[in-house]
């Protein structure tokens, strides 16, 4: 009895799969219709909040893409479950009729359920067909028309070869942004749209923060993971085999050779000193001393041979890391725009004192009084990482010129951009700097 009941539950679950999958796709299509109805509320957020136009656009586009993905995934599950049911029906011809099984089979052929399924499928098909035209008309054409009307206040999306050009933040116009936002909030209060706008703005802020943090995590972990995977699985065994078999040289640079010779001279002098301190000059055997020096020479050769392999490995690993990071920047232009907007909003939401504090902290770290010593350590580490000679003249030349260039760039950014956005930040910065 229990066995038959378990079989009946399995059959019931399998035959219910098409209805559940179709219901998921139907709810996702309803979600698309809701996003399209709430489109004008999203558009009002632009005038009543600090959100950038790109963040709103990418939020709407992401929600639509998620719903479309759920629809296609549910329809695939629907087709697979129908295929499984057909297999059950075919195999049922080879077995004896089961009363429980017969109770389930007629449910598939009910006319009402068939009509309901056909209506839902037609609704989903019409929603997907309408979505592309809706996107072209509202997400592109209407945005471009709004850009022409409000170009004195904001910078919107621009159309170029049917593609979107990313703009990081709202531009400065003749009318201050605080006035337009206050007017838009007052208008929303009059039309009883404040609660819905707050909810939409919260969802948009949540999406913007999550998308930015995910992109930062991808920029940090994916290049490291890819380079580490290639290093351990492919590059390290291949380079060791290639260097030890096909390369006769041991030292990759002259700096390594000079360093090894100095080390060998120090070892030989230490051996002579140890023998002289232990025995008299007449009892020192040159053969034993030569064997010990020869053994230390072999160990030094092995050490510097491994160092040469590590230098080549570091070069290829860093190249893979750079290529992976460049691909992430190229493929993630939309996320980069959102990250730029989110970072600017975080910066502009701070008080003038905190803004000036972070600017001073960054400038003092890079071009402050103690920064040349830090730059010397960084450059020396980079030279040792790639196996180059530790040249004091090159390091001093770089340290004496590069911070000056950075100082010029910082001053240009402060007086060019911050002076336009918020003159009080520049005044606070000069006060704290003095």
Swiss-Prot record:
It comes from Marchantia polymorpha (Common liverwort). The keyword RNA-binding does not apply. Belongs to the CemA family. InterPro entries: CemA (IPR004282). One of its GO terms (biological process) is potassium ion transport. Signal peptide: none annotated. This is Potassium/proton antiporter CemA. It is a multi-pass membrane protein. Contributes to K(+)/H(+) antiport activity by supporting proton efflux to control proton extrusion and homeostasis in chloroplasts in a light-dependent manner to modulate photosynthesis. Prevents excessive induction of non-photochemical quenching (NPQ) under continuous-light conditions. Indirectly promotes efficient inorganic carbon uptake into chloroplasts. Its main location: plastid. The chain crosses the membrane at residues 75-95, 210-230, 311-331, 359-379, 395-415. Keywords: Antiport, Chloroplast, Hydrogen ion transport, Ion transport, Membrane, Plastid, Plastid inner membrane, Potassium, Potassium transport, Transmembrane, Transmembrane helix, Transport. One of its GO terms (cellular component) is chloroplast inner membrane. GO terms for molecular function: antiporter activity; proton transmembrane transporter activity.
């Amino acid at each position: 009895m229990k066995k038959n009941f378990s079989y009946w539950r399995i059959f019931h679950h399998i035959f219910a799969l098409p209805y559940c999958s179709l219901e998921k796709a139907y709810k996702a299509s309803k979600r698309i219709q809701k996003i399209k109805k709430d489109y004008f509320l999203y558009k009002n957020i632009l005038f009543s909040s600090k959100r950038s136009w790109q963040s709103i656009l990418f939020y709407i586009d992401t929600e639509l893409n998620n719903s479309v993905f759920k629809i296609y995934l549910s329809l695939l599950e629907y087709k697979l479950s129908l295929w499984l049911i057909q297999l059950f029906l075919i195999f049922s011809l080879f077995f004896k009729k089961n009363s429980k099984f017969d109770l389930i089979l007629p449910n598939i052929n009910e006319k009402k359920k068939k009509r309901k399924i056909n209506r839902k499928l037609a609704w989903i098909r019409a929603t997907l067909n309408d979505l592309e035209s809706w996107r072209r008309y509202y997400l592109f054409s209407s945005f471009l028309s709004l850009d022409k009307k409000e170009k004195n206040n904001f910078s919107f999306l621009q159309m170029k070869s049917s593609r979107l050009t990313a703009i990081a933040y709202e531009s400065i116009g003749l009318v201050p942004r605080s006035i337009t936002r206050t007017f838009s909030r007052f208008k929303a209060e009059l039309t009883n749209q404040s609660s819905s706008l707050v909810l939409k703005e919260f969802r948009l802020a949540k999406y913007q923060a999550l998308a930015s943090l995910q992109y930062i995590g991808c920029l940090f972990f994916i290049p490291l993971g890819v380079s580490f995977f290639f290093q351990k699985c492919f590059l390290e065994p291949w380079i060791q085999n290639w260097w030890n078999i096909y390369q006769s040289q041991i030292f990759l640079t002259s700096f390594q050779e000079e360093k090894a010779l100095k080390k060998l001279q120090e070892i030989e002098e230490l051996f002579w000193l140890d023998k002289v301190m232990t025995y008299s000059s007449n009892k020192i055997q040159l053969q034993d001393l030569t064997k010990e020096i020869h053994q230390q020479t072999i160990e030094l050769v092995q050490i510097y041979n491994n160092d040469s392999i590590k230098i080549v490995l570091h070069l290829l690993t860093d190249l893979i890391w750079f290529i992976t990071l460049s691909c992430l920047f190229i493929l993630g232009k939309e996320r980069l725009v959102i990250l730029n907007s989110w970072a600017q909003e975080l910066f502009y939401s701070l008080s003038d004192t905190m803004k000036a504090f972070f600017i001073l902290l960054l400038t003092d770290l890079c071009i402050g009084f103690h920064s040349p010593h830090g730059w010397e350590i960084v450059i020396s580490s980079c030279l040792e990482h790639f196996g180059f000679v530790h040249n004091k003249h090159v390091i001093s030349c770089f340290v004496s010129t590069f911070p000056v260039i950075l100082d010029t760039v910082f001053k240009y950014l402060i007086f060019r951009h911050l002076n336009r956005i918020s003159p009080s930040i520049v005044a606070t910065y000069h006060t704290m700097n003095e």
